[in-house]
């Protein structure tokens, strides 16, 4: 019974995160519309509320293209794996009801975020383009450099909280 409740809770968490991201993009588009002195995306429904769902339908019905000489499987699997890794990070967040019990939640957070680096590199490599590969390697270098400082700051906070 506890497994079913944690599964339902994690599914509800994932759905809420994805819907909130969709509405944050709607908020961003509205704010940019007001900044540029034009109306934002308010043509669909009441004040543009169904706009994220219309954007999702448009996104899923688009034609899928891929580079001719690319590694097709890893080219499409790496962004999906990156999405799953970013959603796994939400599992270690503390809520009122504990979904999963993590003794080392900070280490799980650092591991999931550091694994996300490799998906960018695999996506750049699998496109079989030198520019995409260089961009992926640049993103890996930037992400590793900020993760080292993030880990050091986190360990320093942990150390000072124990004193």
From Swiss-Prot:
It is found in: Mitochondrion inner membrane. One of its GO terms (molecular function) is NADH dehydrogenase (ubiquinone) activity. Its EC number is 7.1.1.2. It catalyses: a ubiquinone + NADH + 5 H(+)(in) = a ubiquinol + NAD(+) + 4 H(+)(out). Pfam families: NADHdh. Keywords: Electron transport, Membrane, Mitochondrion, Mitochondrion inner membrane, NAD, Respiratory chain, Translocase, Transmembrane, Transmembrane helix, Transport, Ubiquinone. GO terms for cellular component: mitochondrial inner membrane. PROSITE patterns: COMPLEX1_ND1_1. The chain crosses the membrane at residues 3-23, 77-97, 104-124, 143-163. One of its GO terms (biological process) is aerobic respiration. Coiled coil: none annotated. Its main location: mitochondrion. It is an enzyme of class 7 (translocase). PANTHER family: NADH DEHYDROGENASE SUBUNIT 1, NADH-UBIQUINONE OXIDOREDUCTASE CHAIN 1. Core subunit of the mitochondrial membrane respiratory chain NADH dehydrogenase (Complex I) that is believed to belong to the minimal assembly required for catalysis. Complex I functions in the transfer of electrons from NADH to the respiratory chain. The immediate electron acceptor for the enzyme is believed to be ubiquinone. This is NADH-ubiquinone oxidoreductase chain 1.
């Amino acid at each position: 019974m506890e497994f079913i409740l944690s599964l339902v809770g994690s599914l509800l968490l994932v759905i809420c995160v994805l819907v909130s991201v969709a509405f944050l993009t709607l908020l961003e588009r509205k704010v940019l519309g007001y900044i540029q002195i034009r109306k934002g995306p308010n043509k669909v429904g009441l004040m543009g509320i169904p706009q994220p769902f219309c954007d999702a339908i448009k996104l899923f019905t688009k034609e899928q293209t891929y580079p001719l000489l690319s590694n097709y499987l890893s080219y499409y699997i790496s962004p999906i794996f990156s999405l799953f890794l970013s959603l796994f990070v939400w599992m270690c967040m503390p809520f009122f009801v504990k979904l999963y019990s993590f003794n080392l939640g900070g280490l799980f957070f650092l591991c999931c975020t550091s694994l996300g680096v490799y998906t960018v590199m695999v996506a750049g490599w699998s496109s079989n383009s030198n520019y995409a590969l260089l961009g992926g390697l640049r993103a890996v270098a930037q992400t590793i450099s900020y993760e080292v400082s993030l880990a050091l700051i986190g360990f320093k906070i942990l150390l000072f909280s124990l004193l």
